């Protein structure tokens, strides 16, 4: 590949990133429905037509944000290897996930992500997509716990992963509806310890992963 083509690719990546960051900033400031593509392009310092080179609609920005979240999960998965059991890994994942949503995704963006998936006709239902990296990560941890004899085997790992992610979406949705009326990390960890982990366990009694 020539230097010129490398430079064009770098410029394209820079422009796409600028449009994405501008859109996310504006969505947080003004709300998704109040932002136009022209607003996004102006904020990014590029022509309106450039937007359509990288995105078809504003909704594509939402999909891109989900991909960014999944990229975080990929990085996080590597850090979980330092824990010795699947129970500890899921507990650590849950805590990191809650912190990431609170501190990096943020309340306003979370509202936009959920409302877009619920309200937009024809929108890609990425929140419930079992092909997402998140589902595969949780399924892998459940399978590990089943091999260790810690997690129940009367329900498939795939089904348990589905129920797990559904449960945590409920926590995120409750936080968004309440408009940050409770501590997402604190209550999210309580939900994990009191509800989710006992439901995964091979025995009937609740166990805590805290130390």
Q: What does each model-found stretch correspond to?
A:
Residues 44-55:
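Short hydrophobic/aromatic patch on the recognition helix
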Residues 20, 91, 95, 135, ...:
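An amphipathic alpha-helix signature
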Residues 110, 124, 128, 146-193, ...:
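Hydrophobic/aromatic-rich alpha-helical bundle segments in the mid-to-C-terminal region
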Residues 64, 78-104, 157, 161-164, ...:
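Hydrophobic alpha-helical connector segments
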Residues 1-30, 34-46, 60:
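Basic, helix-initiating cap at the start of DNA-binding domains
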Residues 98-139, 150, 159:
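Short secondary-structure transition hinges
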Residues 55, 61-69:
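Alpha-helical DNA-contacting segments of helix-turn-helix folds
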């Amino acid at each position: 590949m020539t230097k010129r083509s490398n430079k064009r690719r770098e410029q394209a990546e820079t422009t796409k990133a600028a449009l994405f960051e501008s859109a996310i900033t504006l969505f947080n400031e003004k709300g998704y429905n109040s932002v136009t593509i022209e607003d996004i392009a102006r904020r990014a310092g590029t022509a309106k037509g450039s937007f359509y080179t990288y995105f078809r609609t504003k909704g594509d920005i939402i999909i891109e944000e989900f991909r960014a979240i999944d990229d975080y999960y990929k990085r996080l998965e590597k850090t979980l290897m330092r824990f010795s059991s699947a129970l500890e890994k899921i507990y650590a994942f849950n805590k990191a996930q809650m912190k990431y949503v609170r501190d990096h995704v943020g309340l306003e963006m979370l509202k936009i992500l959920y409302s877009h998936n619920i309200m937009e006709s024809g929108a890609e239902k990425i929140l419930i997509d079992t092909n997402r990296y998140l589902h595969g990560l949780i399924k892998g941890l459940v399978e590990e716990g089943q091999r260790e004899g810690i997690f129940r085997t009367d329900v498939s790992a795939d089904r348990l992963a589905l129920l797990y992610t559904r449960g945590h979406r409920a926590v995120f949705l409750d936080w968004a509806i309440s408009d940050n009326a409770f501590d997402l990390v604190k209550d999210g960890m309580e939900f994990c310890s009191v509800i989710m982990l006992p439901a995964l366990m091979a025995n009937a009694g609740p166990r805590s992963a805290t130390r």
